[in-house]
From Swiss-Prot:
It comes from the Bacteria. Keywords: Nitrogen fixation. Belongs to the UPF0437 family. Coiled coil: none annotated. The lineage of its organism: Bacteria, Bacillati, Cyanobacteriota, Cyanophyceae, Nostocales. This is UPF0437 protein asl1434. Signal peptide: none annotated. GO terms for biological process: nitrogen fixation. InterPro entries: Helix_hairpin_bin_sf (IPR029012), Put_N_fixation (IPR007774). The keyword Transit peptide does not apply. The keyword Acetylation does not apply.
């Protein structure tokens, strides 16, 4: 049971950090989009990085839900 608690806490900490990073990436992507066509060459890289952060966040949230339901 202690192992599960630690895992849940670790995942919650990772989610918190990723949420902060994801919010910043979302704002960066928004700012880049507002400035189009300037810096359009960066659009795919920023979008891909933003997608990856949100994919990781979704994966962690699903893992957390499984651990919490297993209790």
């Amino acid at each position: 049971m202690q192992v599960e608690e630690t895992s849940i806490e670790e995942i919650q900490t990772k989610i918190k950090r990723l949420n902060s990073k994801a919010g910043q990436m979302k704002m960066d992507l928004h700012d880049l989009a507002e400035g189009l066509p300037t810096d359009y060459t960066q659009l795919m890289d920023v979008a891909a990085a933003t997608y990856e952060i949100y994919r990781q966040l979704d994966e962690l949230k699903q893992e957390l839900k499984k651990l919490e339901n297993a209790k």
